[in-house]
């Protein structure tokens, strides 16, 4: 039991959302607060959190620390990294606060004063792409957000929090600096936004056509988009994923491998990696000498790095699945 709990806490910190006990019914209020703190730390990153303490205490941040912060948030340069870190911290807490306030009417209606804690917890969990929920009871464990499958407010707020947290801090910076003038965005931000939109829209359309046939039109649209948004990085669900068809599950596996974007609260192979590989494939088929997008050419090193990351991810994915299948004596498709 102790080992199970420690594994669960590890998943909290690593933003995976996997649990061995129901978070809502198993843990006390203090335990849930610790989990929330770990989710927030994992979402922002240890380096960002440590740097924030240094800034609050008035300590000078060394060049080496600035370089580490640059790597942690995938910033293009060391210059302005402290300003960017402050922007990330302020933006994070503001967005999480807005998300919590928007969900208050629904959760307070259903849970009374406890709804305040529910709103805060799920706002942070969604923004940090953790996928943890505290809606479980001793009678119904691991419900996730299935009770709110037809609630537009909860669906839309959670989806927006997941997407905003998953597109990366530099993309926020571009939006706040350049507003809707997309031409002035960094190349990375442009790729992230286009890839994210495609990776949300295409699976949602597939789910809409292949699953949820018994739902009303509005409920079906919400369920399709919610599952598409959450499966890549977060881990919430409003529908019974086990009841979805095998083709949908295969798409889910691929989307989970891709994950979120660089410098974000999400994990995975990253949207930019898959985008570079697809663009390089099109360039190869078109017999183009170099990979180009938005008028910019990729260095061959970028393409090689993307291919290396993808190969490593797929190797670890299959190796992990085979290992679990052999150890637990279950079908490989269930791993």
Which residues fall in each region the model found?
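Membrane-proximal intracellular helices of multi-pass ion channels
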Residues: 1-335
């Amino acid at each position: 039991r102790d080992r199970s709990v420690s594994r669960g806490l590890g998943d909290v910190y690593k933003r995976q959302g996997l649990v061995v006990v129901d978070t809502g019914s198993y843990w006390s209020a203090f335990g849930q607060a610790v989990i929330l703190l770990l989710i927030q730390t994992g979402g922002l990153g240890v380096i960002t959190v440590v740097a924030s303490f240094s800034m609050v205490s008035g300590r000078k941040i060394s060049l080496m620390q600035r370089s580490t912060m640059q790597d942690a948030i995938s910033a293009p340069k060391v210059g302005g990294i402290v300003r960017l870190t402050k922007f990330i911290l302020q933006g994070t807490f503001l967005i999480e606060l807005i998300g919590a306030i928007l969900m208050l009417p629904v959760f307070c209606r259903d849970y009374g004063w406890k709804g305040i804690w529910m709103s805060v917890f799920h706002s942070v969990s969604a923004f940090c792409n953790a996928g943890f929920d505290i809606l479980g009871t001793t009678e119904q464990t691991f419900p996730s957000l299935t009770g709110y499958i037809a609630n537009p407010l909860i669906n839309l707020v959670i989806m927006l929090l997941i997407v905003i947290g998953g597109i990366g801090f530099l993309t926020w910076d571009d939006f706040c600096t350049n507003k809707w003038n997309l031409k002035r965005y960094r190349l990375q931000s442009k790729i992230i936004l286009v890839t994210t939109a495609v990776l949300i829209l295409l699976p949602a359309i597939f789910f809409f056509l292949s699953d949820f046939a018994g739902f009303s039109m509005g409920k079906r649209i919400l369920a399709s988009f919610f599952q598409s948004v959450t499966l890549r990085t977060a881990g919430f669900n409003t529908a019974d994923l086990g009841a979805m068809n095998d083709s949908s599950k295969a798409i889910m596996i691929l989307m989970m491998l891709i994950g979120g974007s660089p410098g974000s609260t999400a994990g995975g192979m990253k949207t930019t990696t898959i985008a570079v590989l697809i663009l390089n494939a099109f360039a190869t088929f078109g017999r183009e000498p170099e990979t180009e997008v938005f008028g910019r050419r990729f260095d061959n090193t970028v393409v090689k790095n993307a291919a290396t990351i993808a190969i490593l991810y797929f190797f670890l994915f299959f190796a992990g699945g085979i290992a679990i299948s052999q150890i637990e004596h279950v079908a490989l498709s269930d791993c």
